[in-house]
A protein has these predicted regions:
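Short cysteine clusters
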Residues: 187-191
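Extended alpha-helical interface modules used as scaffolds for assembling large macromolecular complexes
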Residues: 225-235
Length: 235
């Protein structure tokens, strides 16, 4: 980080009504595949990952509000860093039915993968013993690759717990989306939103995610692929 930059800290009032959340771009690279298996029809791998992060801004979010979105404030100089950790990767099936009904297929597809990533992480708590807070996620909006990784440098075991119980996590995720009563295309905090989302809970599509999860749980087969040129990472 440039040496001439600095952070100025000021004390805020006790009743300050906001908290901040960073806006990030991330890119995963598989360093080593430790093991692979099929979860239903989905090929899933447990890997050593190199995660590159760029913090380009933050949002102010009002305390107590249900929708975890806020006003964006961009940094003049983004902060970049990287680390090695462990995680899983799988290739989500395309939500072809919802895409066919959409006026913007590219947005609908990418937003479906992003929402699926959110739901699998947040929905894993009851399956893995409460490790979702220790996990990060990246969905690649063109290829449909979804990475879920340990937030701790070197790994923490959280993603391995998810890898071992992945079928149950996928079934649980499908029911979370299907049974949520909200009618919003993007979903809501009960289904697709994440309080840790690095994209301000944008690029989310509830119905696209539901089709993806239904296809997975119905046994549709996919194999791992390489990222494609122009893949848009969403976190």
């Amino acid at each position: 980080y440039p040496e001439k930059n600095f952070a100025k800290i000021e004390r805020i009032p006790k009743d300050y009504p906001y908290y901040t959340k960073s806006l990030t771009e991330e890119w995963p690279t598989i360093e080593t595949i430790f093991e692979k298996r099929n979860a239903g029809g989905i090929e899933i791998a447990f890997c050593k990952l190199h995660i590159e992060k760029k913090v380009y801004g933050y949002v102010n979010i009002e305390l107590g509000q249900e929708v975890t979105q806020g006003e964006k404030i961009m940094l003049d100089t983004p902060l970049e860093y990287d680390f090695i950790t462990k995680g899983i990767v799988f290739h989500a099936p395309r939500p072809l039915k919802i895409m066919d009904e959409s006026e913007d297929e590219e947005y609908t597809e990418a937003s479906g993968y992003h929402a699926t990533e959110h739901v699998v992480i947040e929905g894993s708590n009851m399956i893995t013993g409460g490790v979702s807070q220790d996990l990060g996620g990246i969905s690649l909006g063109t290829s449909g690759l979804i990475f879920i990784y340990d937030g701790a440098i070197g790994g923490s075991g959280a993603s391995k717990a998810l890898y071992d119980r992945f079928e149950k996590a996928l079934e649980r995720s499908m029911h979370i989306v299907k049974e949520c009563p909200c009618k919003n295309e993007a979903g809501c905090p009960r289904c697709t939103f994440s309080y840790r989302c690095g994209n301000n809970n944008e690029y989310l599509h509830k119905y696209s995610a539901l089709e993806i999860l239904e296809r997975i749980n119905n046994g549709e087969k996919t194999e791992l692929i390489d990222p494609v040129d122009g893949d848009k990472p969403l976190v």
